């Protein structure tokens, strides 16, 4: 984006910092992931997990969820005020898997939230380390993006299920801060806004009184976040209209859905960060790696390098394919659920297949699943090359944004065309161009019509050998121009249910 003078880099958002230079950013991001690693090691000690059990991704997820729950102020307050049967508001826990006599056993553990908070703060130099918590939320969100489809949620808000590539970060909690807002897709922001407007339509008092004033501030803030993701003047002008509306209603919902559709071709800028499971940082810290001293970046070579030398295991159900389970976690680690499969495959060095062809369910194991038949296997999370993560959406320039396949939001800054089915997308734009946003709508449609599927994005950007940490020799891959690669093609994944 042209005007990045005032923007903080998303490493700065991630660490809550003011403007810092590159070295300071690397150090503070390093401090953040180092703290996660120290916390994880301490939890493994508390739970007396063996080395193998500590590398089990399911155990990592349980421990991550416990600390997120321990710091969820609003929910904790709610639980204390609305005691529900069988839920202790002061405790948190989950399933821990242990290896016993050649079999995997599930053990449900329960901890005082206060105790978990103490361990977390201790691992983070006595601070609350909110940035580390957000980092874990984004890792869970990336895992959800790769695992589940949000068709139902899209349909409920009146959007088209084919807009799934705009839904990055749709399961992030509201408290995920600026770093969370940066990774949310256009569709996610639109959906949050539509839900808000619908509540206002159904509940007369939603915008009224002291609470309503706060609601209004939240509404305008969300509008500004979404506006900042758009890269064309007309899209931004439409967002101003939506934001300034005296009494948001169906007209605003229409405008928002129009904007979401337009983002399939005039893509928004959405940040991508490689957030890894806590156990990976734990392994590195345990082996003596000093993240803060070495520095760390979420968008460069560091996560790739970390995954090259980490062995992580996963429980595998009887008819699941371990290679497919690995692909799922690899995509989650690199926030690549919405990336073009041609690009992901090239970087990973093995073919990345669409989700409809995966023989694997989610990573987490439900409490009613039979442990007798559970096996475990090593996740293959290594890559052949590395590439810089992007936040641009891959539009060729400001004036004329380039084309987007109906289902790609680029993750890696790598030269390619972004193929799309123009007829499918444009069919949605017949009809309504009257009303107060008519000139903007006309302008947006004109830009979309002039976008070409064969336009090359990220000109000259390539992938790098893993030995090339300074990114000096880009290798620009050549792709079959016609062959689009959406992960969600022929999809049969399960829905995301809270």
Curated annotation (Swiss-Prot):
Post-translational modification as stated in the protein's UniProt record: Late in virus-infected cells, may be cleaved from a 56-kDa protein to a 53-kDa protein by a cellular caspase. This cleavage might be a marker for the onset of apoptosis in infected cells or have a specific function in virus host interaction.
UniProt-recorded name of the protein: Nucleoprotein
Gene assigned in the entry: NP
Organism whose genome encodes this protein: Influenza A virus (strain A/Tern/Turkmenia/18/1972 H3N3)
One GO MF term attached to the UniProt entry: RNA binding
Motif extent (Bipartite nuclear localization signal): 198-216
GO biological process: symbiont entry into host cell; viral penetration into host nucleus
Function in brief: Encapsidates the negative strand viral RNA, protecting it from nucleases. The encapsidated genomic RNA is termed the ribonucleoprotein (RNP) and serves as template for transcription and replication. The RNP needs to be localized in the host nucleus to start an infectious cycle, but is too large to diffuse through the nuclear pore complex. NP comprises at least 2 nuclear localization signals that are responsible for the active RNP import into the nucleus through cellular importin alpha/beta pathway.
InterPro entries to which the protein is assigned, alphabetical: Flu_NP
Subunit-level organization: Homomultimerizes to form the nucleocapsid. May bind host exportin-1/XPO1. Binds to viral genomic RNA. Protein-RNA contacts are mediated by a combination of electrostatic interactions between positively charged residues and the phosphate backbone and planar interactions between aromatic side chains and bases.
Lineage of source species: Viruses, Riboviria, Orthornavirae, Negarnaviricota, Polyploviricotina
Keywords from the UniProt entry: Capsid protein, Helical capsid protein, Host nucleus, Host-virus interaction, Ribonucleoprotein, RNA-binding, Viral nucleoprotein, Viral penetration into host nucleus, Virion, Virus entry into host cell
Protein family: Belongs to the influenza viruses nucleoprotein family.
SUPFAM superfamilies assigned to the protein according to its UniProt record, in alphabetical order: flu NP-like
Chief location of this protein within or outside the cell: virion
Short motif Unconventional nuclear localization signal, span: 1-18
Region (Disordered): 1-21
Subcellular location: Virion; Host nucleus
Any single GO CC term annotated in Swiss-Prot or TrEMBL for this entry: ribonucleoprotein complex
